[in-house]
Amino acid sequence: MGERLLVSHFYAHPVGHAVEALHYAHGHWGSDTSREVSVLLNARTPVELAGLCPWVTRAYAVDHPLLERCADSPARLAHVPREWDWVLDDGRRYQDWQLELFPGLREFSAASDEWFACRIGRSVSGQHRAGYAQAPWRFQIPRQAADAATDTLNGTGPRIALMPAGSSGPEHYPSTASWHLVLDGLLEAFGPDLQVVLIGKSSDEDGRTATAGAGRYMTLRDHPVTPMSAYDRPLVEQLALVEACDAFLSPHTGFGLAALACGTPWLTLSGGRWWEYFFNGVPFRSILPDGAHASGSFAALEPEPLAADGDAERSVSMTQARIRADVPRIVRAAQELVNGTLSYERAIAEYYAELRTRVEPAAIWSIDNVHVAYL
């Protein structure tokens, strides 16, 4: 039996952070496939995604607060085996500002330092000290779910999965009226055979993230495209539908990382706090905001400026004026991705050439530092 590694990624619970951990697990397994690689995740994140990754031996869910302090951190780790050859931490736990922002992360980290015993060593996930082979990977969607998705999307036209919002406040995402403009453009470009499926989750009562403003976005089903709704279906079923589509369309959201793990090209209405930083060897397009519409974007945790947008205030990069101006760019990008005319290398080179005009190059970061080769 080879070495036993634990990728310890206790962090915020949006789905994208689980995908990050599984990506690192794949890289550490890929450097020596005789290894047994397990992952530790926040219990509120979709831990079941590890079951779609045959290189993951086991996933450990840890029920521990992130935003608040915790009086019994050691007890919450007791079900995780203590002894490993390697424990590989999420690098965020070594960032002082993260520990200030998330007191629970500080206490989890201290408890894990006390609990884990490493035969060889401890490092940061993605670092080569413990062996790491960066390579694209894909979720292994169960055949039954994949076949059901194919049966559901049984038309002959282009297929686009649409997630209209992520899990932050509704002011960070386009309005229903803006999405109607996008669907108008897509319908004109692709014709009546276009199939659109709505992806999302309407409630966070189970402790997991939900799609902001989910109820309002259900009115998109009244658009002439007649999107079908996959809202609130089990996560694996929704991922199977995404995998069966030609493109995944959304604002910046961690679910986009899951789409890339399905091998589905991601078309992002970029803007807001974060740029796109994970790519997984899949063609993509990020429609970066231009000019005044970019005001306040990509400032991480700094407050975003809001602008009047109909009957609400919205991030400047997500207003109807911005979306209307960018519909032609969105449609062209959708055509590239649906038609398969865009290579990954061209996509990433053009993305970073444009991003560096919006963000100081020294401030840009990405998973596995893939940006370095393009700046």
Identify the residue ranges that each predicted region occupies.
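Conserved nucleotide-diphosphate donor binding/catalytic pocket of glycan-assembly enzymes
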Residues: 54-141, 147, 156-165, 169, ...
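N-terminal pre-catalytic "stem/leader" segment of glycosyltransferase-like enzymes
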Residues: 1-55
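Active-site donor-nucleotide binding/catalytic segment of nucleotide-sugar enzymes
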Residues: 6-9, 89-104, 148-214, 272-274, ...
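Gly/Pro- and small hydrophobic-enriched strand-loop and loop-to-helix capping segments
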Residues: 260-292
